[in-house]
């Protein structure tokens, strides 16, 4: 158990137990909380990077005979983290110089937000991770045969305010589910033999599903999609003989 400044604390517990000469196990769990350092001005100075994490593990060893051992491992961890404490740095000198080259004047219209973290949607990363494995070892008179089977499951979600401003423009929610199965078989000579040799095989299979839709909100639909499209149409319409064109979007939310 521990505690620190900025509202950080953690606790963990582990137990070891030997039931018999043939079976023993250990198990444990933990929880961690981080209060965070950075504040978001657009969300009442809410901590951007606070986080919570917890998990548990189990290991069991079974020896049914003198030459056979089974080792089982299971571990799970869940975390929910805030993050991405990006802040506005202002218009760069290079951008101002480039605008002047193109005959345009660029002025700072967001001076009040320089150096401040200020975005309206809470950005975060959430993850659940499961790892498990079984190791079976058989000792014959002249060799040792071991087989290790592993499985991993990952389920995570990243939510990001992509405009990183106090305006309600657009965000992304990326979800991922990944599964991996692996197998390793090793055949080797026993220690102390004149000839030491080893051979084996390894293989794995993984399948992954990812989604990452971008959500344009009402202000984003207007400023990013509709206004940009109409600016392009104005340039086309300014050419001699070109038709007058325009676009109006009636949807307040658009998933892409």
PLM region spans:
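Outer-membrane beta-barrel translocator/receptor signature
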Residues: 1-40, 46-56, 67-68, 128-130, ...
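Alpha-helix N-cap/helix-initiation motif
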Residues: 4, 46-49, 174, 239-243
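Conserved small/polar residues in nucleotide/adenosyl-binding loops
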Residues: 254-256
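Feature marks flexible
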Residues: 101-119, 204, 209-242
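Outer-membrane beta-barrel domain signature, strongest for Gram-negative TonB-dependent receptors
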Residues: 45, 51-198, 204-206
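Sequence/structural signature of outer-membrane beta-barrel proteins
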Residues: 4-8, 34-41, 79-81, 154-156, ...
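Short acidic-aromatic active-site loops that bind/stabilize oxyanions
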Residues: 1-2, 31, 122-125, 236-243
């Amino acid at each position: 158990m521990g505690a620190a400044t900025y509202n950080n604390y953690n606790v963990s517990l582990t137990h070891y137990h030997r039931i018999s000469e043939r079976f023993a196990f250990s198990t444990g769990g933990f929880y961690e909380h981080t209060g965070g350092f950075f504040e978001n001005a657009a969300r009442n100075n809410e901590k951007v990077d606070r986080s919570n994490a917890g998990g548990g593990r189990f290991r069991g060893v079974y020896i049914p005979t003198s030459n056979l051992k089974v080792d089982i491992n299971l571990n799970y961890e869940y975390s929910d983290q805030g993050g991405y404490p990006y802040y506005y740095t202002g218009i760069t000198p290079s951008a101002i110089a480039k605008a002047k080259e193109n005959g345009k004047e660029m002025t700072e219209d967001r001076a009040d937000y320089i150096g401040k973290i200020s975005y309206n949607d809470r950005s975060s990363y959430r993850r659940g991770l499961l790892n498990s494995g079984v190791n079976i070892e058989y000792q014959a008179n002249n060799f040792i045969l071991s087989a290790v089977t592993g499985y991993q499951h990952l389920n995570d979600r990243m939510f990001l305010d992509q405009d990183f401003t106090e305006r309600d423009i657009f965000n992304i929610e990326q979800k991922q589910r990944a599964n991996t199965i692996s197998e390793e078989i090793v055949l080797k000579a026993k220690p102390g033999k004149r000839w030491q040799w080893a051979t084996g095989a390894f293989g794995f299979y993984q399948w992954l599903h990812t989604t990452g839709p971008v959500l344009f909100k009402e202000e984003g639909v207007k400023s990013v999609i509709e206004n940009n499209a109409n600016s392009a149409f104005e340039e086309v319409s300014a050419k001699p003989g070109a038709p007058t064109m325009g676009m109006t979007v009636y949807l307040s939310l658009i998933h892409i």
